[in-house]
Amino acid sequence: MSRVGKLPVAIPNGVTVTVTPDNVVTVKGPKGELVKAMSNKINIAVEDNSVVVTRDNDHKDVRALHGLTRALVNNMVTGVNEGYVKTLELIGVGYRAQLQGKKLVLSLGFSHPVEMEAVSGVEFEVEGGTKVKVKGIDKELVGAVAADIRKWRKPEPYKGKGIKYENEVIRRKEGKTGKK
């Protein structure tokens, strides 16, 4: 039995979960609604304020899908109830972020500013010009947008300049020692 898959997903107050016969899971909550089609090899049922994920056989691919499906449903329930936030920090001289409407404009040392349009389901928030918060109810989408922002200037190991996640630790390297 999957250690993750066998745990039921608790449904908090204000959240409703519906499952269609073809395994399309719909989760509605105070922050919005998420719909996701799951594999037909897995059984999903809503039983007394919790979602239970089970499997019919022990094939390797079905065992892998068991834990995955439970984790996806749990992420959907958490997303519509609390939401997800990824915080990015801009470290470097002249590295700045600002909002222009729903557009995020980054000054990252290029000859031009980098503009990123907010994808539907995701919103940006800028704190102090050097912190960018990516917020949304879909964990996968929030992570993907944050990774796209980070991709413009990954942190370098010598001075630590670049865009990094808030809790990310950058492994630093020693520079050249030079002649003496």
Curated annotation (Swiss-Prot):
Gene3D superfamilies, from UniProt? Ribosomal protein L6, alpha-beta domain
One cellular component GO annotation, for this chain's record?
Answer: cytosolic large ribosomal subunit
One GO BP annotation is: cytoplasmic translation
Keyword flag Ribosomal protein: yes
PANTHER family to which the protein is assigned, alphabetical: 60S/50S RIBOSOMAL PROTEIN L6/L9, LARGE RIBOSOMAL SUBUNIT PROTEIN UL6M
Q: Which NCBIfam families match?
A: L6_bact (TIGR03654)
- Annotated protein name in UniProt: Large ribosomal subunit protein uL6
Q: Which organism is it from?
A: Clostridium botulinum (strain Hall / ATCC 3502 / NCTC 13319 / Type A)
Q: What is the lineage of its organism?
A: Bacteria, Bacillati, Bacillota, Clostridia, Eubacteriales
